[in-house]
């Protein structure tokens, strides 16, 4: 007998709306309630709040919901200061009092360290800076909408490729925020807006930097308008026709000062977003590492020399190692510029065994490492082979710090200090620093 196709019935959600009590926050800042004993994650909610939520996703072990109505607010809830909150993907915790955010981030750090490494320790005071107007770097997304014939200018929405149009951003430093409306007006009238990729904004110590990434040729008259805007704001203008090409059109080469050291950089180089927290972070790293005039120090993932240069002023020698060759060359130039002659820099793949590398043939007294979010799993097991009695680990991901800490503890190190660095206020993102000693 012939069988006819029958479409599967759509799974019906348990209910369009559910009233729940939020019990805690997850490590990404989402509220956690429980529905039939299953964790339900709801963005924009706080512990102790009674809310009405609409299920947007339901799996066997968890569900996600959208906040529909706030029935009982938490004492820590505050009014967001940005009109784009809940749309822009940048800040996700503007609804929470700042001091409560700090407490939440410190709890998160402690919980992760205990879960993965079994370590329990009293936290050092958090390193903080300005709550607002702290970002000295931002990437503005651009997209030409063929239907509306309008240029979309702003930041990506949360977990989306869509752009939230903005002409103000309260977490940007003032010299960058004031550029937004003017840049949008100028770029909207370019003859070939479909060639525009994004704008990178950086606040260097010698002025703002505007970098326009474009994917096709631009008219000279359009570039002239952009140059005029940059000159009026005493900013440096770069064009980036390809991801590995930079052309300085006007202005000075940018640099920033770091506790007495001048660090030149290009707009596509990595620098820390929060200048005040970065300065305090470097000072704390020096205090914890405590380099002496007889110490040989290894700086892994050294970048432009953010830590290497200050360490070199106190140690016998510094060896900086970085996975990006261009950064290695710039770090060496920066050392020379600052008249540092006891630092050397090497390019190496820090995701694999490095013990056989020439620079690793001698022992080191102390080590500092500052890896990317993925952590240092490729090399962490080799740290003890280098002979260091003291290791400072600067982390931008507490989960990978906790994972790598387990390896250091197994190598005989003790976790003696741990602290949170609030590099990104009003977001769930947290950075941290840990000191390990033998």
Swiss-Prot record:
PROSITE patterns linked: SAM_MT_RNA_M5U (PS51687), TRAM (PS50926), TRMA_1 (PS01230), TRMA_2 (PS01231)
GO biological processes: rRNA base methylation
Bridged cysteine pairs (disulfide): none
Catalysed reaction equations from the record: uridine(1939) in 23S rRNA + S-adenosyl-L-methionine = 5-methyluridine(1939) in 23S rRNA + S-adenosyl-L-homocysteine + H(+)
Binding site for [4Fe-4S] cluster: 82, 88, 91, 169
Active site positions: 396 (nucleophile)
Positions of the TRAM domain: 11-69
GO MF entry, a single one: rRNA (uridine-C5-)-methyltransferase activity
One Pfam family of this chain: TRAM
EC number: 2.1.1.190
InterPro entries noted in UniProt: 23S_rRNA_MeTrfase_RlmD, MeTrfase_TrmA_AS, MeTrfase_TrmA_CS, NA-bd_OB-fold, SAM-dependent_MTases_sf, TRAM_dom, U5_MeTrfase_fam
Alphabetic keyword roster: 4Fe-4S, Iron, Iron-sulfur, Metal-binding, Methyltransferase, rRNA processing, S-adenosyl-L-methionine, Transferase
Signal sequence, renumbered to the chain: none
Domain of life: Bacteria
Residues the entry annotates as binding S-adenosyl-L-methionine: 272, 301, 306, 322, 349, 370
Family designation: Belongs to the class I-like SAM-binding methyltransferase superfamily. RNA M5U methyltransferase family. RlmD subfamily.
Physiological role: Catalyzes the formation of 5-methyl-uridine at position 1939 (m5U1939) in 23S rRNA.
Protein name per its UniProtKB record: 23S rRNA (uracil(1939)-C(5))-methyltransferase RlmD
Organism: Vibrio vulnificus (strain CMCP6)
